[in-house]
Amino acid sequence: MNRLQHIRGHIVSADKHINMSATLLSPLSTHVLNIAQGVPGANMTIVLHRLDPVSSAWNILTTGITNDDGRCPGLITKENFIAGVYKMRFETGKYWDALGETCFYPYVEIVFTITNTSQHYHVPLLLSRFSYSTYRGS
């Protein structure tokens, strides 16, 4: 290993540590896994919404892009994380297009209810071109 590779290893490790810290600080996290190819779902756009209980309108809270590990650190701050109904929209069609593939689902929306804001909620997305699955992780 030459000196530049050694230095790069420290920088990449630091970046992963920073991203993991941001993930741990956010009370809501996700992880996209491309189960068809056995790789993380990198570079996928995710839009986080919260339902307004009065108007029944979906309000966009944030937009992010998954990193090389398929994660989207810092989706929401603890201050903005209140009880309510949330929706994560994953732009799966654009993801598969970028890989030169077609898919059946142009996007995936996962709607869930938050009641206890002191807990951490993990909402992973496992997907292939023709199916997807999710669950509530910790």
Curated annotation (Swiss-Prot):
Q: Where in the cell is it found?
A: Peroxisome
Q: Where does substrate bind?
A: 31, 71, 135
According to the UniProt record, what class of enzyme is this? Answer: hydrolase
- Known catalysed reaction(s)? 5-hydroxyisourate + H2O = 5-hydroxy-2-oxo-4-ureido-2,5-dihydro-1H-imidazole-5-carboxylate + H(+)
**What are its GO biological-process terms?**
purine nucleobase metabolic process; urate catabolic process
**SMART domains, A to Z:** TR_THY
Specify the superkingdom.
Answer: Eukaryota
Q: Does the keyword Hydrolase apply?
A: yes
Q: Which CDD domains match?
A: Transthyretin_like (cd05469)
**Quaternary structure annotation from Swiss-Prot or TrEMBL:** Homotetramer.
Which family does the record claim for this protein? Belongs to the transthyretin family. 5-hydroxyisourate hydrolase subfamily.
Q: What this chain does, per the record? A: Catalyzes the hydrolysis of 5-hydroxyisourate (HIU) to 2-oxo-4-hydroxy-4-carboxy-5-ureidoimidazoline (OHCU).
Q: Under what name is this protein listed?
A: 5-hydroxyisourate hydrolase
